[in-house]
Design a protein with these regions (language model features):
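Short Pro-Gly-centered beta-turn/loop motif in secreted/extracellular proteins
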Residues: 103-109
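Beta-strand signatures of extracellular beta-sandwich domains
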Residues: 124-126
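Ubiquitin-like/PB1-type beta-grasp interaction modules and other compact soluble beta-rich domains
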Residues: 1-83, 88-90, 101-103, 118-119, ...
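Short proline/glycine-enriched turn/loop motifs at strand-loop junctions of beta-rich domains
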Residues: 108, 116-122
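Extracellular beta-rich ligand/substrate-recognition surface
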Residues: 93-94
Length: 169
């Protein structure tokens, strides 16, 4: 699928003739994220599975304006979102901390997570060898260890960052 432009539409009461690739200059166009990661191939190269989140976004600066800074080779996990009131993270999130405890109530059977990182890095969530997607339910019990791994898009570089969360009931 190749989206070059959207034509003849209305936005906030204004008729737009054409909005697309190069409409906002030579560095503008469409970019695609798969689970909050700017993909490194065309959209047709990826198999979408249940739970995937795909977003077509418009950039006017080769992606830097929407989180795809090609010059930033960091895989650093910079934030952690625990959806809802699932529990208390200890210590509080800090870029330099690599190991956390999430204390949950006994009635919590699953949690949903989303880590923040450079969108040129792919963030993956594991319990053992089972991978979960951002915001998908991750089953938890006392002692469950969730590994969050961020890998810079160029996997040959070996640039990664890993955090672990141990569940305490």
């Amino acid at each position: 699928f190749y989206l070059s432009a959207i034509e003849n539409f209305t936005h906030n009461g204004e008729v737009i003739d054409k909005f697309g690739e190069f409409s906002a200059g030579y560095m503008s166009g469409w970019m695609i994220t798969l689970n909050d990661w700017f993909i490194n191939m065309g959209a047709s190269e990826f198999l979408v599975t249940e739970g995937d989140t795909i977003s077509w976004q418009y950039t006017s600066n080769l992606g830097e304006d929407i989180g795809a800074d090609w010059m930033n080779t960091s895989a650093k996990i910079t934030g952690l979102n625990i959806v809802g009131n699932a529990g208390q993270l200890s210590p509080a999130f800090d870029n330099e901390v690599k190991s956390y405890t999430l204390t949950v109530q006994k009635n919590i059977e699953a949690i949903q997570l989303k880590a923040e990182a450079n969108k040129m890095s792919r963030v993956q969530y594991y319990v053992g060898s089972v991978e979960y997607k951002p915001f998908n339910n991750i089953p938890v019990n006392n002692g469950t260890v969730i590994t969050i791994k961020s890998t810079y898009e160029d996997t040959m570089s070996g640039i990664t960052d890993t955090d672990e969360i141990t569940i305490k009931v």
